Amino acid sequence: MVEIKPTKQQLSFLDWEMGAFFHFGIRTFYEGHRDWDGKVMDPKAFCPTGLDCENWIRTIKEAGLTYAILVCKHHDGFANWPSKYTEYSVANTPWKNGRGDVVREFVDACRKYDIKVGLYYSPAEAGYQERSPKEHDDYFINQIGELLGNYGKIDYLWFDGCGSEGHEYDKKRIVTAIRSLQPEILIFNMWDPDTKWVGNEAGVANVTNSNVVSSLDFSVLTENKDDLATERFLPTECDFRMRNRNWFYSEYDVHTVKSVEELVSLYYYSVGNGANFLINIGPDRRGLLPDVDARRLLEFGKEIKRRFSQPIPSTWETTENGIDIKLDGERLINHVVLAEDL
């Protein structure tokens, strides 16, 4: 029997426990637009009046989160950095007269506050079918090269499979490019994955969630699975939205911000079932976290700290019948945290 063990990076990922997802880009400035709706979004609309990535990262740090993921390019194709391989980027916006770089500001903020750096990239985008498969792979690998080659150490690369159904990517070439630039990086869910998607966007892992799998859920658009050919250890991640309706900011769904009780419940359904908790907040058109969302995240973090930050002193030893746990006296216990010894 082959023993399946996690890598050092995967063990670190499990210890991260809670992260933040930031959907911010051209769609932030176009109310009501949806994935793949074909609507034109002029880059001239991108002009945050007070972008402050430190505002984002300070908030999640205070809430007890340990990693953050920025959407660098969503399905619309807009690049949040001045990519040499497209004109559809921050370089052709009025923000900072075209000299701004959201990715740079995000990465610098994460490093300042000791938050692990994650970058999201959608391999597919509107109109990509007009390129030949090789042309699209060239474009994709060139942009990934910019993200992984120009911003120092990146801890996590988050690929979104949505929209990639049917395209045959050059897997070997892609993985070689990524691993050569960032040998210790964690890759989410695709091609040579180190972590896996839970299979829903509700933030919920099943009680039977296992980190040892032989196939992966690929996209919300299909029930097809990606066959891994062999069993692998892949920690699970549960992504979900602070607001019930949108990943990007909307001025019309503030009433759907989740309550502290809902967030705590999702913590139990994710971390409590052996998965990571990844909450999305869409920064607003100022380039700041919406006040209501930021306040709710801090309230949630305070509640998690209240429940878990002062464990009861104990010792334990293994016996023939299991494990004996000894406390320092009579105690009322309302939570038990169990973890596999890896």
For each feature predicted by the language model, list its residue ranges.
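Mature catalytic domains of secreted/periplasmic carbohydrate-active enzymes
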Residues: 1-342
